[in-house]
Regions:
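Active-site metal-coordination/substrate-binding segment of hydrolases
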Residues: 44-48, 53, 63-157, 161-165, ...
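A non-catalytic alpha/beta surface segment that caps or lines the substrate-entry region
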Residues: 21-67
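His/Asp/Glu-rich mid-to-C-terminal helical/loop segments that flank catalytic regions of hydrolases
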Residues: 209, 227, 231-256, 303, ...
């Protein structure tokens, strides 16, 4: 750790932000709300102390740039927005660790590092208000679906387009933000794990292999409504019975392939206590880092649903709700992340990310990307009890700073090639 890096300052600033933007129920920095704007003003004041070039792009992402000897840029990303009643670290740790790294780099290199270093606060990573996650980063990557996004409204009926306008953002120009990635040569992101894997392994930090691919479907079983008292069990065409069999089957499929499956919603018709279920709709969310394994998981689930439908003399239909391809992160940056963690903590574990992150959108744009996870106490996030040990936060800032330095040195190394170039 260099003298200019102060992980305890990151801790103090995280607590300062918590006091400013949280209540007894947790963090309230929902994007495109007054508290979120207040948090951004607070962050901007911190950035202005470093005399950086600061601006907001067409999608509402805020960029702070320390110009270097080269225009090629190392980008450090995070998000200051939260879910309602959220935790104090999700997203904000990324930004404030990045802020501390900017301080160190500016001091060490007398204001002129070998490459430009940029910190970005992505707009609306959580999607808590309008239901669309990764808003700012997907606009910047060019993958945002404007047709689907145009009609989004919050629970009060306020249109996303109108909320954007209130914050000075023109919906029609969202994709113009893509110019921000033109000189990006590497992207790194620190994040709390939001799960229990590092906790169970008793490890402070982990290197992220990539983000899971997602197959999310609605599955509807249709049978026959009948009186619950007068219909014998062997004469029922019970849609719920067939749907219920999918629950243990989803666990079998997930365990067999090393992925995860979740049946998250279930609704029935006619939905009364005195009727056999005529229609049962469930949602199945399947995730895996390997696209072939994810495809096999989906195929097995389809075959199983057909079998259960036949056994119960009901029909079944599928509707795709979401498909996201698995996104592996850059192997060279992953090796540097592994190295930085070993130098800091002595041990490291490589794991995939189940949740989606802005890093995935940057990787989809073709920018070499790496992520580092820090252990989450209780394995819980998106909750006011979200927490991480202070010594682990400090270790994360130190290791993340090492990764930033290693990434900069990699960028100026002659003959460097990316995964995409090596595989072309």
């Amino acid at each position: 750790m260099t003298a200019a890096l102060d992980p305890q300052r990151t801790l103090r600033e995280l607590k300062e932000l918590r006091a400013l933007t949280s209540d007894e129920n947790g963090a309230q920095r929902v994007a495109f709300t007054p508290i979120w704007a207040k948090a951004r003003d607070w962050l901007r004041q911190k950035l202005e102390e470093l005399f950086l070039e600061i601006h907001r792009d067409e999608a509402g992402n805020v960029w702070a740039t320390l110009a270097g000897e080269s225009d090629q840029a190392l980008v450090i990303g995070g998000h200051i927005d939260s879910v309602p009643n959220g935790g104090w670290l999700d997203g904000s740790l990324n930004l404030l660790a990045g802020l501390e790294i900017l301080r160190r780099i500016k001091t060490q290199y007398s204001g002129k590092p070998p490459v430009s270093v940029r910190l970005v606060d992505w707009a609306d990573e959580e999607g808590a208000r309008f239901g669309m996650s990764l808003f700012g980063s997907s606009a910047c990557s060019g993958h945002i679906n404007l047709a689907e996004t145009r009609g989004l409204q919050d629970k009060d009926g306020i249109a996303l387009i109108d909320a954007l306008a209130e914050h000075g953002i023109d919906f029609e120009r969202l994709k113009d933000s893509g110019r921000e990635l033109q000189n990006a040569e590497a992207y790194i992101e620190l994040h709390i794990e939001q799960g229990p894997i590092l906790l169970d392994l008793d490890l402070a930090l982990g290197a992220v292999l990539g983000t899971f691919g997602v197959e999310r479907h609605a599955i509807t079983f249709r049978g026959q409504a009948a009186h619950s008292g007068s219909t014998p069990m062997n004469r029922r065409r019970d849609a719920f019975l067939a749907a219920a069999k999918m629950s243990p089957e989803s666990y079998r499929i997930a365990n067999h392939h090393g992925g995860v499956c979740t049946i998250g919603t279930c609704s029935t018709l006619p939905g009364i206590a005195t009727s056999v279920v005529a229609e049962c709709r469930i949602t199945l969310d399947q995730r895996h880092l390997d696209p072939a394994a994810l495809a096999r998981m989906l195929e097995e689930a389809r075959h199983s649903s057909d079998r259960f439908a036949e056994e119960g003399d009901v029909s079944v239909s599928w509707e795709r709700l979401m498909r996201i391809e698995p996104i592996p992160f850059d192997s060279e940056l992953l090796a540097l992340c592994d190295e930085a963690i070993r130098e800091t903590c002595g041990a490291v574990y490589c794991l995939p990310s189940g949740p989606l992150h802005d890093a995935a959108e940057v990787a989809r744009a073709g920018i070499p990307t790496a992520m580092m996870f820090v252990q989450s106490l209780y394995g819980i996030s998106h909750n006011k009890i979200e927490d991480t040990k202070e010594e682990h936060i400090e270790a994360a800032v130190i290791a993340f700073d090492k990764l930033a330095e290693k990434a900069m040195q990699l960028m100026v190394r002659p003959g460097r090639s990316t995964d995409a170039e090596r595989n072309s």
